[in-house]
A protein has these predicted regions:
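Helix-to-loop junctions at the C-terminal end of transmembrane segments
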Residues: 59-72, 261-274, 358
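C-terminal transmembrane helical hairpin of 12-TM major facilitator-type secondary transporters
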Residues: 272-319
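Conserved MFS/SLC helix-loop-helix module at the cytosolic interface between two early adjacent transmembrane helices
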Residues: 57-97
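Extracytoplasmic gate region of multi-pass secondary transporters
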Residues: 27-28, 208-252, 256-260
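Helix-loop-helix hairpin linking two adjacent transmembrane segments in secondary transporters
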Residues: 133-185
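Helix-breaking motifs and short loop linkers at transmembrane-helix boundaries and internal kinks
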Residues: 39, 71, 92-97, 241, ...
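Cytoplasmic helix-loop-helix junction between adjacent transmembrane helices
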Residues: 102-136
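A late C-terminal transmembrane helix in Major Facilitator Superfamily
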Residues: 329-363, 370
Length: 387
């Protein structure tokens, strides 16, 4: 690869991860207004999240084959256009059912590219750059709620937020279309080579207690991260009386703290042992969730959410990085596949369960829910670490 091409590839990859994160934080801020528009109960956010999860899983299974046919650059363009189509449909539909249907389309777009672009990054970039790529996802997830909050508080409404999101993703798709050649791998390098005799069988990996435990860790982590992000705005506005503008800032600060935490981890990666950072995040997250539980006032809830995002931030990339050491090189390829699938399930199922609980026990149940999830995450990790 030429030096000029390499210089452009890293910023392009950063932008690609921003595009992946951009839609993820928007829904939690839009949901109170959206459900009032369609007169839906609070827990039906779960229907949307489950539809997205189904689309993600459906496309992620075939993502590798699609990449082989289209190439990563064209797949990235298609992914942006699918999510843009979903956002545009949301902005225009007069009915709730298309919201659920096009959530599936949005999941298709995200699932098709997520694994492929992570695999591309793994073959091209250092661990520090990969961590910063995931930080860029957090940057996108932070920007979405900020824009949606500004539009809602200005009186433009949630529909304009999704229209702007669609336009942004179309612009990104056009930019990626113009830079297709930057994404092409050299001949024979489309897929990382697998060392012979290293990867164990699928059934053998499933029989490993450590693989099963790690899969549950990812389910709980992604579920806790998504639950906090999707329900924070509703909790702060509908239960704690915070203004939409301030609550939107708090929701954005949560996603922003994930961005900041991963950025900081990239800087600390060569100076602090990964295991120490992982334990810091896992032990601190329940304390942050406890702050969310106990502080009913605005500043305390704001601080609790920010601390929770900051402490959750390094867990996902560190768990991925530690997987070969924890389960062995033999099981690592299958284990990582199980973990990503479990994270997708957790990000859909746990926020849906939190919504079901909120409808029956009130939005204040979110704090104890997060506390329980983060405590289970810590206990499960420590139990595995002692083996």
């Amino acid at each position: 690869m030429s030096r000029d091409r390499r210089r452009w590839l890293v910023p392009l990859a950063f932008l690609a991860f921003v595009s992946l994160g951009l839609p993820d934080g928007v829904l939690g801020v839009a949901w109170p207004s959206l459900r009032r528009t369609f007169d839906r109960p609070i827990d039906q956010l779960g229907l949307i999240l489950l539809s997205m999860m189904a689309g993600y899983l459906a496309s992620s299974f075939g993502g590798g084959a699609v990449q082989e046919r289209l190439g990563l650059g064209r797949l990235l363009v298609a992914s942006c256009l699918l999510v843009a189509t979903s956002a545009a449909a949301w902005s225009a539909t007069p009915f709730f059912l298309p919201i659920v249907v096009f959530a599936f389309v949005s999941g298709l777009g995200a699932g098709a590219i997520d694994a492929s672009i992570n695999a591309f990054a793994a073959t091209r970039f250092t661990p520090r750059v990969i961590t910063w790529l995931h930080a860029c996802w957090g940057l996108g997830a932070m920007a979405g709620p900020l824009v949606m909050t500004a539009l809602i508080t200005a009186g433009a409404g949630w529909r304009w937020g999704y229209a702007l999101l669609a336009a942004s993703l179309v612009a990104m798709a056009a930019f990626f279309r113009l830079t297709l050649d930057q994404w092409e791998l050299p001949n024979g390098a489309r897929r990382p080579a697998r060392p012979r005799g290293v990867a164990g069988g699928l059934r053998e990996a499933l029989r490993s207690p450590r693989v099963r435990a790690n899969t549950l860790l990812f389910f709980l982590y992604a579920g806790a991260e998504s639950t906090a992000g999707q329900w924070a705005f509703s909790l702060l506005t509908e239960s704690r009386g915070m203004t939409a503008a301030t609550a939107g800032l708090a929701a954005s600060a949560y996603w922003g703290s994930i961005f900041a935490g991963r950025l900081a981890f990239g800087l600390l990666a060569h100076h602090v042992a990964p295991a120490a950072l992982l334990r810091l995040g896992l032990a601190g997250a329940p304390l942050a969730a406890l702050v969310v539980c106990l502080t009913r006032g605005g500043p305390g809830g704001f601080a609790g959410l920010f601390a929770l995002g900051l402490l959750l931030a390094p867990i996902f990339p560190l768990l991925i990085a530690e997987t070969p050491n924890q389960v062995g090189e033999r099981h690592a390829p299958h284990a990582i596949g199980f973990q990503i699938s479990a994270a997708t399930l957790g990000a859909g199922l746990l926020p849906a369960a939190a919504g079901f609980l909120a409808r029956r026990a009130g939005l204040e149940s979110l704090g104890p829910f997060l506390l329980a999830a983060t405590l289970l995450l810590l206990l499960l990790h420590e139990r595995g670490a002692r083996r």
